[in-house]
Amino acid sequence: MLKRTLYHFHFCCGLGGGAAGFNRARPRVGNVEAHWECLGGIDVDPAGLRDFERLAGVPGTLLDLFTRDQYIRFHGTEPPAGWREATPEDIRRAAGGRRPDAVFISSPCKGASGLLSEKMSLTPKYQALNELTLRCIWLMGEAWADDPVPLIVFENVPRLASRGRHLLDQINSLLGGFGYAVAKTTHDCGELGGLAQSRKRFLLVARHVEKVPPSCTSQRRRACAPSATSSAACRFPATSRPPAQCTAYRPCSGRPGCASPWCAPAATGAA
């Protein structure tokens, strides 16, 4: 088995959940097996970066990705003394001077969230926040323009596809200019992870056409049946139920100690 190391880097990295997931991945193609190492991440929240270092295993970089105009529209005031706009060189420095194999971008989603009213989402404050999506793509592309990142993964709330349609059109154009082919879809993290919760996300995947062949596939959904060691245990809280496509569970028949209406796998139900 041939071993290979791949490197990932994160924009708006938060506390590092995405980076931790990359670190756990062990992709295998034929007789080649790879493991991922994190080069770092960028965020504006110091507390989040402390968690990022703990989960990702490497320190992140405290950096504001707003342009000056975006900063003023979001905060309602001029930037403090000493503040400056981030540059492509700042991005390369945050990655330790290395070019990653994949970049994960999870820019703030509040402006496109259904939890925010349409009226509020159109205010200058939240329009500036939404524009970080485009800003991150531009900084990433310019940072490694001479040696493009092979794969870009961009995720956000599903409503970005409607409220942020104009931004996605610009992102598509920008990525095309940098040499990327783009695919957009939505997925449910609950289905992918075999969880009892539905958490839908918008997903954009961009591959550099000169570096990555057209062979990217969607993540397989996990089987929703319990593990062999917990087949008698309840997996779903009383307020939840299995995903609609899951046939491995049946309504609870009142097993002693069972607090969920959905528990044991059906006698004939393999996931």
Walk through the language-model features, giving the residues of each.
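Generic beta-strand hydrophobic packing signal
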Residues: 39-41, 103, 152, 185, ...
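Active-site donor-binding loop signature of nucleotide-sugar glycosyltransferases
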Residues: 63-65, 189, 220
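Core alpha/beta nucleotide-donor-binding catalytic domains of modification enzymes
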Residues: 2-148, 158-169
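S-adenosyl-L-methionine-dependent DNA methyltransferase catalytic core
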Residues: 1-38, 49, 174-177, 201-271
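Residue-level signal for pocket-adjacent positions within structured domains
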Residues: 60, 107, 182, 187, ...
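Conserved Class I SAM-dependent methyltransferase catalytic core
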Residues: 129-206
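Short secondary-structure transition/capping segments
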Residues: 83-92, 100, 187-205, 230-242
